[in-house]
Design a protein with these regions (language model features):
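N-terminal acidic leader/helix
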Residues: 1-22
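Intrinsic disorder/low-complexity signal
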Residues: 3, 17, 39-40, 64
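Acidic, Ser/Thr- and Gly-enriched intrinsically disordered low-complexity segments
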Residues: 8, 63-65
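Compositionally biased amphipathic helical and low-complexity segments enriched in hydrophobic
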Residues: 13, 23, 28, 58-59
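Short E/K-rich amphipathic alpha-helical oligomerization segments
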Residues: 18-37
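Short, charge-rich amphipathic interface segments used for partner binding and complex assembly
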Residues: 31-63
Length: 65
């Protein structure tokens, strides 16, 4: 795989980690009584999964995996 794709994959992995941290923060807020935080956490988690999927696709070398 080209260095450019490796770089993009690494950036996506970093973004996924940031999203995971944000999701944890929203869960903590939900426990503290923030009514909208649980819905935000679910949305952030869906986005994190999509970013992880994109990163995995770039790392696999095959779009059919």
């Amino acid at each position: 795989m080209g260095d450019d794709l490796d770089h993009v994959r690494e950036r996506l992995e970093g973004i996924a980690e940031e999203l995971a941290d944000l999701a944890i923060d929203r869960l903590r807020a939900a426990v503290d009584g923030n009514e909208g935080a649980a819905a935000e956490e679910r949305r952030i988690t869906r986005a994190r999964r999509a970013v992880e999927k994109a990163s995995n696709l770039l790392g696999s070398g095959s779009p059919d995996d």
